[in-house]
Regions:
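N-terminal accessory regions of nucleic-acid-interacting proteins
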Residues: 1-46, 115, 126, 179
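Short active-site oxyanion
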Residues: 23, 95-100
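Short acidic, Gly/Ser-rich segments with clustered Asp/Glu that frequently serve as metal-coordination loops
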Residues: 45-58
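Acidic beta-strand-to-loop metal/phosphate-binding motif
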Residues: 47, 99-105
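A short alpha/beta connector and helix-capping loop motif
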Residues: 56-73
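Short alpha-helix plus adjacent loop in nuclease-associated cores
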Residues: 126-146
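Acidic, Mg2+-coordinating catalytic module of metal-dependent nucleases/exonucleases
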Residues: 145-185
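Single conserved hydrophobic/aromatic residue that forms the stacking wall/gate
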Residues: 182-183, 187-194
Length: 194
């Protein structure tokens, strides 16, 4: 498999948009969290990402509002602004038997540590991982486009992740991001790139 190093903005604009094909579950209570984590503990690999309410005021910041964790079939959107980072989620993040893939995981975990202490295990940082195959771009959108010739829409990135109800666009965006992390890790794990 031959992989390009980079992709330009004009090329990216022309690509078809990827849409999350599975089920999306919004988790807003501790009991829902326990059920979701029970399912996720049975999966061999998970895509992990987080969203924080954007701040447009200098010096103001917010805690992580949404933790999205996806398997191949479904994505769970944990509303941390409503539940906090509960013990079942901490146990999942610390579980060494489940591979967790992400992009800029260091930043995600740094922000999540503000909600609760934990020692994440079995994590793959995709920015480092894809570099060994010659991919120089670091954004999720560009890495995905290089590998799959589809683009991930980023129109919801700066939306209010602490809203009382997430819009369909926000749910689709969050789930697509998390699943795409698994997809990025797959071809590079299976196929030697030359």
């Amino acid at each position: 498999m031959i992989v390009r190093r980079t992709i330009d903005k004009d090329e990216l604009k022309e690509l078809p948009k990827v849409v999350f094909p599975g089920r999306i579950h919004v988790i807003q209570s501790e009991s829902e969290t326990e059920k979701a984590v029970a399912y996720l503990l049975s999966q061999p690999i998970l895509g992990i990402d987080s969203e924080t309410r954007p701040s447009f005021t200098k010096g103001q910041s917010h805690k992580v509002a949404l933790l999205q964790i996806s398997s191949e079939e479904c994505c769970f959107l944990f509303r941390l602004n409503m539940t906090g980072l509960t013990q079942p989620l901490v146990d999942l993040l610390e579980n060494p038997g489940i591979i967790k893939v992400g992009l800029s995981l260091k930043d995600d975990f740094m922000m999540l540590h503000k909600r609760a202490p934990f020692n994440q295990q079995s994590c793959i940082e995709l920015q480092d991982y894809v570099r060994q195959f010659g991919i120089q771009d670091k954004s999720l959108q560009k890495i995905y486009a290089i590998l799959f010739k589809e683009k991930i829409s980023k129109s919801q990135r700066l939306s209010n992740w602490e809203a009382d109800v997430l819009s369909d666009g926000q749910k689709q965006y969050a789930a697509t991001d998390a699943l795409s992390l698994i997809h990025i890790s797959e071809p590079t794990r299976r196929t030697p790139i030359s």
